[in-house]
Structure formats: structure tokens, C-alpha cells
Amino acid sequence: MTERKTEIYFKMLREMRDVVFSTVAADGTPRARIIDVMLVEGEKLYFLTAAGKDFYEELMRTGFVAVTGLNSNWETIRVWGKVRNVGQDLLGRIFEENPSMNNVYPGESRYILEVFCLEEGEGEFFSLGTEPIKRHPFSFGKNTYRKKGFEITDTCIGCGICASACPQQAIDEGSPYVIRQENCLHCGLCFRDCPAEAIIRRNGETDREEEAV
């Protein structure tokens, strides 16, 4: 069976394990903390928290979370989307697969914990460990991802200024010139320097395209 990119990226987050989970507090300000990725099944990511924590209240109130992790190869996974409280049915399995949890919540104290599932949203793989850099947007669940960055339109005059300015050499000669989206930093140098104003921001159109490996 072919494995989708999303499944691979979720498994990478599980291997990173201790990653940053971000939410919005009741006063509208951001909050971030390190949380363990407890379980990954296909395109579903599971984590847990205690019912008395602010994190729990923020998840229940907003229904959204953003997650960021970095590994030793300078590869970042970012995901954001909807979360759902799935109760305590998975607690036993989570404690089996994460035995250190027994030291933090021994015995019956585990039942203050509730499990959440991130199952619908967007994400991006981004690697600074390669030259040029690599990025890959993806979506999971019923969601689509929004195109970001820049593109060169047909009003391109072929001067090559954008290609010379690009710090990752991610722009190929042509008519018009073409930005290799998988290698683009999204820095905006080409957008700023184009004398013909032929470079535009990608307008957020959605896409479901995703490679399988």
C-alpha cells in the first residue's frame, strides 16, 4: 500500500515526540508549550492533557491547535487544524506505548487526562538541511491547503533580475521565468526587485495535490 506524505510527516512528529503546541488564550494572546505526540494512526495525530490545565480549556473553547517540531537534520514539520476531544478510550494504549507517562500520572491519576485528535487541517514540511531548501505543503482530513509564496506572470520581460536575486537559485529561465515552489524561501526578494511588477503573491487558492511515496 502506498504511504501518503502526510502519514510520513506525522510519523516524523511522533519521532520528534516533544514538540511545540500553540493555542489562543481567552484574552486573544498566543500560548505555546511542549507536548508529547502520543500516537499516530494514518492521518490522525493524538495527544493528551489534564482537564485542569489552561491548555485543555483553550482546546475545548477554540477547537484548533498548531504544532511545530524540528529534528536533528534541520527538518521542520508544521501542522495546524481542528482538534476533537476523543475521551479516554485510548488512554490504556497510550500509556503502553509511552511508559514514562506512568511516572507522571501513576495509578488512577491518569484518569484526569483526556485524549485529543488532530485529524483535519494543513501542514508543511520544510528542510534547511539541503541545498537548496525544500518545502512541501500538505493537507489532511477533509481539508485543502492554501497556496503560498509567489509566482511569475506572463508580463515577465525576461530580464533575469529575479533569478539573480534569489538566495536559493530557485528561479528557472523561461518565458515567463518560473519559481520552483519546492525550493522557494518565500522571502519576497524577487517580488520586491522585479522591474516589470510581473511577480505576484499566490492568492491562497486551495489544492489537494499530494505525492505518494
List each model region and its residues:
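Solvent-exposed segments in extracellular or luminal domains encompassing
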Residues: 181-184
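A short, well-structured catalytic beta-strand-centered motif of the EAL phosphodiesterase domain
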Residues: 35-39
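A short, Trp-centered hydrophobic/proline-enriched beta-strand micro-motif
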Residues: 11-27, 65-69
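Short, structured beta-strand-loop surface elements
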Residues: 54-122, 128
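Iron-sulfur cluster-binding cysteine motifs and their immediate structural context
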Residues: 161-178, 189-206
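Short active-site oxyanion
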Residues: 42-46
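Ferredoxin-type iron-sulfur electron-transfer modules and their immediate structural context
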Residues: 113-115, 120, 124-165, 169, ...
